Each structure stands twice: as C-alpha cells, then as structure tokens.
From Swiss-Prot:
Keywords: Antenna complex, Bile pigment, Chromophore, Electron transport, Membrane, Photosynthesis, Phycobilisome, Thylakoid, Transport. Signal peptide: none annotated. It comes from Arthrospira platensis. Gene3D superfamilies: Phycocyanins (1.10.490.20). This is C-phycocyanin alpha subunit. Contains one covalently linked phycocyanobilin chromophore. The lineage of its organism: Bacteria, Bacillati, Cyanobacteriota, Cyanophyceae, Oscillatoriophycideae. GO terms for cellular component: phycobilisome; plasma membrane-derived thylakoid membrane.
Amino acid sequence: MKTPLTEAVSIADSQGRFLSSTEIQVAFGRFRQAKAGLEAAKALTSKADSLISGAAQAVYNKFPYTTQMQGPNYAADQRGKDKCARDIGYYLRMVTYCLIAGGTGPMDEYLIAGIDEINRTFELSPSWYIEALKYIKANHGLSGDAATEANSYLDYAINALS
C-alpha cells in the first residue's frame, strides 16, 4: 500500500540517496498529521454504531422508497436494513483505514476500484451512500485537525461515488 512516506522513501532509494531535508520535513509533518488521523479513527470507531444507525436513517428519510420496495437491495425488512447498515459500515471502516494509513490507498485498492461494478451488479444507488457519508461528516462530532483529516477522506469517498 502506497502512502506519502513510502513513496518518498521509494524514490530516494531508487535514486540511491538519503531523504532530503525537505523530504524529512514532510515526514515530520506527516507524523503530526498522523496524530490527528489516529485521533479521528479512534473517535469514528467508538461512535461507529450510532453513526451507522443515523446514516441509515438519513438514507431512509431522503429516499423513502428504499424502505417501501421489496427485494434484496432494499430496506423494507430487517434483513434489508441490516445489509444497508453493513454497507455503510464498510464505507466508514475504509475512512478509518485511510486515516490510519495516511493516504487514500486502502480506499483506492479495496473500494473504489470495483465500486461501479458492485453497485451495477447489485442495483445499488451511489446516492444512498453519498447521503450516508454526508450524514457521518455532519455528525461525527470531531473538531480541529481530527475533523479536517476525517472530512478529507469522507469527501474523497463522496467524490468517488459522485
């Protein structure tokens, strides 16, 4: 998995040199950023159940047909609601993985690469997940650098689905 730090080390190594002072300063900046990312990941993980539940409800409120239509892709029954929560949880986990990794690598490799095919195959609307991610962004309760870090990956996921 590529991160900004592994990229810098890889480039320097391929050129047979030590990291430059600028690259080292970037690394120190990344470590400061990592602290905020870890704080955000911890907070999102501890609030995951309530964020997922609220995000699912936001989807049902904006798209009421999702709870009225029958079928395996809708939330008309508890099984459908459980699937919806599971899928929202998957997006939230990807955000926390990115926060820990310090880059979009986990989301790029494990989610974005096949999301169009998954949504098409299972007849899932990206707009459902966009709404869920917007809810999480508006309600995660983070502030400062932790919020900035979390919001950047939430926005990345929203843009990938748009």
